[in-house]
Curated annotation (Swiss-Prot):
The keyword Transmembrane helix applies. Interacts with CtaA. GO terms for cellular component: plasma membrane. The keyword Acetylation does not apply. This is Protoheme IX farnesyltransferase. The gene is ctaB. Disulfide bonds: none annotated. Its EC number is 2.5.1.141. InterPro entries: Protohaem_IX_farnesylTrfase (IPR006369), UbiA_prenyltransferase (IPR000537), UbiA_prenylTrfase_CS (IPR030470), UbiA_sf (IPR044878). It comes from Jannaschia sp. (strain CCS1).
Amino acid sequence: MSDFTAQTTTEPREYDAGFGDYFALLKPRVMSLVVFTALVGILVAPGGVSPMIGFTAILFIALGAGASGALNMWYDADIDAVMKRTAKRPVPAGKVPAGEALTLGLWLSAISVAMLGLATNWVAAGLLAFTIFFYAVVYSMWLKRATPWNIVIGGAAGSFPPMIGWAAVTGDVSLASVLMFGIIFMWTPPHFWALALFLKKDYNNAGVPMLTVTHGRTETRRQILIYTILLVPVALGLVLTEVAGPVYLITALVCNAIFLKGAYDIWKRDEAMAEADGYAVEKKVFKFSLLYLFLHFGALLLDAIWRLI
């Protein structure tokens, strides 16, 4: 981060940022998952909440997620500039000054936490504040560059939204919200390691110690299978709570069987096989992992609607 910042401060540049560039700082793709899982947390929580309070909670949870994204893009500008997948992001692409990304992230952090606390309760606001801190400071500034287990520990940051949504309604944390957290937490490693299998060169060039870089692809394949196996009981465990019904049970059984099969297929392959078909299996599993979370949380939403009928 320091090298990139030094470059941007010592060499005058012409910035040509539009609204879309500033919006991109908020990582809208990541935000969509945050909003959806937080919304499910709100809608399945007991007691219910008025539509206005629910909308307000989602708005400020989304802003908090966007704040995390902006702070991450500010700090990771040097890494993003090297990686093909991220080189076109607003800061490394020269669209938005790094200082503006930092300022935007800090302001949105303060506003989102304060307003969520005032609109709902300070338990939810405290969880949001911790999430922003964990992602921007613990993960982005430390774990990501320090350990191959960065996404295992750092995955906690992306796992909090349903718990925050739940707390916005109930003012507390329950087993159901912990299990919703756990699903995302255990899903994160196999999801990102599947990506890292076919983007190893990118991470290596950027100096990011992903597991594929430090331990090799063979060990990464083994860890994908291990974490996918560990994910299954967490996902199915939610059936034992009040929020999951028949739609979730069927969805979880089918999705986890597919994900397990994909993880097994990745594990049994060697590099010659993967290179021969352009990492087709790894890419297929990565794409399915994106669908996996939406299907699980969508099923919870359908069960909640079913109970109202």
